[in-house]
């Protein structure tokens, strides 16, 4: 980042900086539980308790212990916590733990009073005095010495009060009444600005807080509009003249060594001024690659009044939408976004420290992210400062997830909130997009949102506007955000492409995006879950505790699986990473797609617990995904391979079409190479592809790869790696020897039930492979568990049991049963067939001593012991039980044939020695249609 300096001065005789009184520290405090403080004039007496500000009731240990009667600010999407027997012990006051979000020790939603004395210095006489409260949550009312000064209720911007008439030099009592209830103005109890699902509905003031004295003629506002096509800088200034008469001023504009002097007469009251300055021919543009910043200093002096100075940081950047694409500074741009859902488990509120935001945003950048969508909230000034320095593109929302257009108070509140946001943060180049909020309701939402977007486009054209995240798609919007272009949607279940269709990397969303003229950004893609990381619980040292994790961990312990907790995390995490790679690459393959917004790069703590992140809620790694790995497929330059299949037989020909998504610089004669390696890293095939130039954009085809597989004589996991100028992406694929069904079925008896033949075989001490047909597993033993290839979407509690209900497989890759079926310890695409033709066997009712060869990782709410494959003794015989259907359509299932072959080879060997004995009667209970 570079800073360039531009100074605008109003001529003056004396330079005196604005003066401030810091109000942070100890304040008197009282909770006004019954809302009687105004009637009883609490602002006239000293409050009895003390708290530290900046801070909240929670950080100060104030409020009520949480229990079943706590009135949360949130929709209770899943009420089973309050009704289900399994949660009864956690509803007891002495052991109260909620399962649906992080839990504070104390909670308070209502009125609280904050009060302190302040001494105004004599030199502030005849000054304009303002009170500045950053991140006051939510509604504030101010009294000075018993006289009310006003009310403000912005959730997003600083609350500022003009106290000039109330603060003469001397001692004064400031009383602040803060009310964090959701009342007439309802932004939605699930809006991340207020909801207990994320940051929590805290009460307090958590940012900068001070009194500021300024001269009676002072700068209220400076808005900077870079007009890059004209190489001009337009300034809009609001200068307040608190004198009763007009004032003469001179303005000197100094830019890159040149000066221009103008004279102005400022009338009493507010004065709007517009000034246009020339920019140099060589503009230092701002974007993700070159976040160049300019500092504009405005200094004002009116004769006999004093000086006022304001410094504004801005960047020279210009957004444009044309031909269905997003352009930044004249070049195509692609939003690789993630949501920021306002989860702050240590404090319960957003940091106003730039260093913390630099930490989070740098982590995002290391994972290839260039864009943050602030879901139904707006971050504080420090976040914008950090994003300006790093070149991060922000989508800001007006703190709502609400019904709009119904004539309720929230309608006018949203216009006011948008105005406050634009005023406070409008100069930041990182403030790139704005929407009303998230997924609106309301019968007249389209009409209202159309007017909202139209109004703001006319008021301030420095950014792009859209109606809302999620819907509706309106012609007035500069760009659209919709959930259609993604792999898994709400209600899709096992019909999504990753669950219903054989693995490939050839699909995209052009069938949807090409129907619209505006650029499209995919809404909340991903939502793929991993198993909880119970070691994370020790990180919750602040106001929130992960009591939900404690509940889940206890269930795992009771089901005898606690020793597998870390393995479940890592294996499910690898599957989660695979699903995100599929989602992101599909987006990068799609024409006319302007970007995506992940949900998310880090975990979401509420809405029944959605462990959707490669990172935890603290933005820290969980152990299964690194920035290096993730940024191979999520970056400004990504090689892509379209492969119609990922599982081959060795009598087939491997084929891949290579293309590139390039949003860096144009690449002339790029070096493009590919190679295929085996599991040991040995290079089996390699080659080069040619392209004269790679433009900025996606869907740039650079060639095809094709070769016969007949020299692959044993089952193998291979890896295709494509490099563009040293930037690498890669994909696993599998090659199996071509085997006929008849060949695989020889030897070991394969049956779908313990019929007479199977029983006779077992009685003689023989070996039997019991493969349950899809749909025949009894409900008591897992038949009601919807199993699929992908990870769980969001979570099963909030989605009311949306399939799949499981998190992939866990196995020992070195187990001899899998010696002819190359695998790692987790799901990969070679397991798609097995998972798509199987049931998860809940084996707890069979025996305590079963040790599955292949585990299925259950939903963390239930933590049932589940198996895909296990072995037992039945009398003298040996039985391998498979939840995988090895009967149906085996001719078209090469992965199933290879897995069956591997299992049978194991059963033929001396290594097949099950030691857990189960009766025939118990085994028969697995199947619903015994005859």
Show where each model-derived region lies.
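Catalytic beta-strand/loop cores that center a nucleophilic Ser/Cys/Thr
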Residues: 777-778, 795-894, 912-931
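Ligand-binding grooves and catalytic loops that recognize ribose/phosphate and carbohydrate rings
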Residues: 406-425, 769-826
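Secreted/periplasmic carbohydrate-active enzymes, especially glycoside hydrolases
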Residues: 1-11, 16-374, 432-433, 449, ...
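Short, solvent-exposed loop/turn segments at secondary-structure junctions
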Residues: 28, 137, 181, 472-473, ...
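Short alpha-beta junction capping motif
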Residues: 746-792, 876, 903
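Extracytoplasmic/secreted cell-surface and envelope-processing proteins
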Residues: 382-383, 403-405, 443-445, 771, ...
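Substrate-binding/catalytic cleft of secreted carbohydrate-active enzymes
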Residues: 361, 371-615
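Short beta->alpha connector loops at strand-helix junctions that form conserved
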Residues: 153, 165, 375-376, 396-399, ...
């Amino acid at each position: 980042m570079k800073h360039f300096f531009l100074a605008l001065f109003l001529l003056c005789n004396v330079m005196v900086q604005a003066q401030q009184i810091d109000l942070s520290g100890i304040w008197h405090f009282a909770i006004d539980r019954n809302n009687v403080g105004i009637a009883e004039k609490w602002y006239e007496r000293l409050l009895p308790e003390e708290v530290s500000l900046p801070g909240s009731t929670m950080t100060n240990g104030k409020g009520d212990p949480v229990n079943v009667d706590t009135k949360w600010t949130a929709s209770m999407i899943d009420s089973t916590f309050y009704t289900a027997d399994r949660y009864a012990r956690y509803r007891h006051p002495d052991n109260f733990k909620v399962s649906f979000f992080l839990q504070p020790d104390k909670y308070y939603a209502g009125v609280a009073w904050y009060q302190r004395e302040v001494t105004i210095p004599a030199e502030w006489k005849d000054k304009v005095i303002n009170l500045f409260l950053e991140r006051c949550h939510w509604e504030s009312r101010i009294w000075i010495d018993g006289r009310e000064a006003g009310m403000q209720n912005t959730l997003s911007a600083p609350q500022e009060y003009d106290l000039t008439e109330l603060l003469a030099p001397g001692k004064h009592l400031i009383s602040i009444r803060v009310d964090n209830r959701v009342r007439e103005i309802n932004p939605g109890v699930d809006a991340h600005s207020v909801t207990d699902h994320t940051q929590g509905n805290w009460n307090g003031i958590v940012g900068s807080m001070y009194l500021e004295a300024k001269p009676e003629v002072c700068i209220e506002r400076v808005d900077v509009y870079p007009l890059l096509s004209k190489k001009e800088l337009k300034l809009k200034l609001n200068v307040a003249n608190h004198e009763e008469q007009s004032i003469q001023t001179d303005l000197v504009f100094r830019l890159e060594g040149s000066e221009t002097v103008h004279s102005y007469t400022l009338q009493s009251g507010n004065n709007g001024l517009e000034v246009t300055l020339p920019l140099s021919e060589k503009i230092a543009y701002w974007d993700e690659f070159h976040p160049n910043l300019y500092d504009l200093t405005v200094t004002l002096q009116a004769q006999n009044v004093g000086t006022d100075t304001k410094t504004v940081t801005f960047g020279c950047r210009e957004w444009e939408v044309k031909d269905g694409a997003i352009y930044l500074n004249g070049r195509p741009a692609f939003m690789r976004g993630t949501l920021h859902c306002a989860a702050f488990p240590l404090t319960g509120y957003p940091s106003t420290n730039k260093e913390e935001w630099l930490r989070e945003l740098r982590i995002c950048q290391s994972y290839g992210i260039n864009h943050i969508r602030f879901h139904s909230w707006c971050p504080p000034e420090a976040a914008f400062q950090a994003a300006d320095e790093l070149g991060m593109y922000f989508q800001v929302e007006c703190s709502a997830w609400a019904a709009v257009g119904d004539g309720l108070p929230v309608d006018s509140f949203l216009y006011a909130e948008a105005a406050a946001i634009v005023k406070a943060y409008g100069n930041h180049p990182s403030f790139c997009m704005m929407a009303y909020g998230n997924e609106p309701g309301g019968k007249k939402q389209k009409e209202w949102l159309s007017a909202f977007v139209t109004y703001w486009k006319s008021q301030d054209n420095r950014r792009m506007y859209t109606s809302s995240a999620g819907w509706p798609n309106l012609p007035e919007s500069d760009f659209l955000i919709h959930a259609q272009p993604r792999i898994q949607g709400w209600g899709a279940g096992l019909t999504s492409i990753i669950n219903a269709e054989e693995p490939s990397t050839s699909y995209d969303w052009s069938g949807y995006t090409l129907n619209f003229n505006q650029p499209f950004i995919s809404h909340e893609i991903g939502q793929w879950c991993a198993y909880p990381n119970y070691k994370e619980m020790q990180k919750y040292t602040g106001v929130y505790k992960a009591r939900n994790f404690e509940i889940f961990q206890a269930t795992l312990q009771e089901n005898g699986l606690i020793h597998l907790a870390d393995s479940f995390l890592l294996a499910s995490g690898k599957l989660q990473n695979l699903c995100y790679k599929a989602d992101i690459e599909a987006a990068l393959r799609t024409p006319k797609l302007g970007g995506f917004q992940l949900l998310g790069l880090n975990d979401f703590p509420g809405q029944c617990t959605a462990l959707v992140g490669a990172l935890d809620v603290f933005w820290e790694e969980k152990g299964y995904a690194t920035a290096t790995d993730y940024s191979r497929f999520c970056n400004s330059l990504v090689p892509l391979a379209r492969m119609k299949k990922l599982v081959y037989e060795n009598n087939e020909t491997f084929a891949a079409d290579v293309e590139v998504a390039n949003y860096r610089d144009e690449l002339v004669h790029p070096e493009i190479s590919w190679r295929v390696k085996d599991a040991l890293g040995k290079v089996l095939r390699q080659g080069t592809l040619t392209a004269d130039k790679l433009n900025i954009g996606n869907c740039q085809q650079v060639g095809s790869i094709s070769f016969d597989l007949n020299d692959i004589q044993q089952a193998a996991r291979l890896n295709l790696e494509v490099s563009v100028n040293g930037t690498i992406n890669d994909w696993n694929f599998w090659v199996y020897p071509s085997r006929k069904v008849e060949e695989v079925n020889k030897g070991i008896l394969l049956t779908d039930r313990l019929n007479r033949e199977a029983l006779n075989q077992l009685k003689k001490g023989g070996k039997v492979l019991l493969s349950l047909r899809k749909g025949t597993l009894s409900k008591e033993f897992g038949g009601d568990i919807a199993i699929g290839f992908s990870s769980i979407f969001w979570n099963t509690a909030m989605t009311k049991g949306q399939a799949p209900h499981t998190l992939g497989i866990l196995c020992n890759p070195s187990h001899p049963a899998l010696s002819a079926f190359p695998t790692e310890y987790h799901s990969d695409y070679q397991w798609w067939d097995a998972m798509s033709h199987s049931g998860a066997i809940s084996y707890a009712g069979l025996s305590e001593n079963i040790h599955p060869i292949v585990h299925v990782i259950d939903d963390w709410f239930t933590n049932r012991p589940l198996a895909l494959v296990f072995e037992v003794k039945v009398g003298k015989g040996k039985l391998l039980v498979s939840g995988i259907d090895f009967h149906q359509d085996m001719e078209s299932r090469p992965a199933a044939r290879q897995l069956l072959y591997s299992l049978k080879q194991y059963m033929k060997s001396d290594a097949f020695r099950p030691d857990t004995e189960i009766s025939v009667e118990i085994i028969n209970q697995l199947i619903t249609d015994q005859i």
